[in-house]
Swiss-Prot record:
Subunit: At high concentrations, the monomers successively form oligomers, long fibers and eventually a gel-like matrix in a strongly temperature-dependent manner. It may be that under adverse environmental conditions, such as low temperatures, the gel-like intracellular matrix can sequester soluble proteins in their native state, maintaining their functional form until environmental conditions become more favourable.
Organism: Hypsibius exemplaris
Residue ranges, compositional bias (Low complexity): 205-219
Top-level taxonomy: Eukaryota, Metazoa, Ecdysozoa, Tardigrada, Eutardigrada
Protein name per Swiss-Prot or TrEMBL: Cytosolic-abundant heat soluble protein 94063
Record bears the keyword Transport: no
Keywords: Coiled coil, Cytoplasm, Repeat, Stress response
Disulfide-bonded cysteines: none
Length: 227
């Protein structure tokens, strides 16, 4: 006993490939696949030999009881072929690709212009802020310069006043020294001792007479002066 089953199947697949650059070189591929299947089965009648009944257990024994002996089967054979067909893009697809490129270019220009406007705004804001800060710094420097001038003026005036006071003090001390020297000289003059020697000689007929004396005068004077 034999059986044969032949099955033929044809499959057609189309695929469109678009280049990433978006240009008009669009390719269309057509793939045709043919499948052929073949199955062959041959069965031989089993030979019957009388034998005592035997009970088979397990999967192998059960399969042998169901199928019996002499069963063979051939595997399926599959074959196929592939064919590629290159097609040129249509006018509509070319126009669509051109419009896509134009839209991409316009959007890119719009992004660049928007970024340029934002940078101009930021630059202008930064310039105004920098000018305001520079004006503040200039005014602070002017104030600092005025403070420096005032400080130098105060320092010079303070130095002049100190020198004047030192000169006045030195003159006062010199005057007091002169006053003390004059006072000492005056006191020395007043305390000087006056000495007088007197000697008298008297000659007469009766005889010779000598008379003498010494006078010492001391004067002390104290003067208190209040300033």
């Amino acid at each position: 006993m034999s059986g044969r089953n032949v099955e033929s199947h044809m499959e057609r697949n189309e695929k469109v490939v678009v280049n990433n650059s978006g240009h008009a070189d669009v390719k269309k591929q057509q793939q045709q696949v043919e499948h052929t299947e073949f199955t062959h089965t041959e069965v031989k009648a089993p030979l019957i030999h009388p034998a005592p009944p035997i009970i088979s257990t397990g999967a192998a024994g059960l399969a042998e009881e169901i199928v019996g002996q002499g069963f063979t089967a051939s595997a399926a054979r599959i074959s196929g072929g592939t064919a590629e067909v290159h097609l040129q893009p249509s006018a509509a697809m070319t126009e669509e690709a051109r419009r896509d490129q134009e839209r991409y270019r316009q959007e890119q220009e719009s992004i660049a212009k928007q970024q340029e406007r934002e940078m101009e705004k930021k630059t202008e804001a930064y310039r105004k802020t920098a000018e305001a800060e520079a004006e503040k710094i200039r005014k602070e420097l002017e104030k600092q310069h005025a403070r420096d001038v005032e400080f130098r003026k105060d320092l010079i005036e303070s130095t002049i006043d100190r020198q004047k006071r030192e000169v006045d003090l030195e003159a006062k001390m010199a005057k007091r020294e002169l006053d003390r020297e004059g006072q000492l000289a005056k006191e020395a003059l007043e305390r000087s001792r006056l000495a007088t020697n007197v000697e008298v000689n008297f000659d007469s007929a009766a005889g010779h007479t000598v008379s003498g004396g010494t006078t010492v005068s001391t004067s002390d004077k104290m003067e208190i002066k209040r300033n």
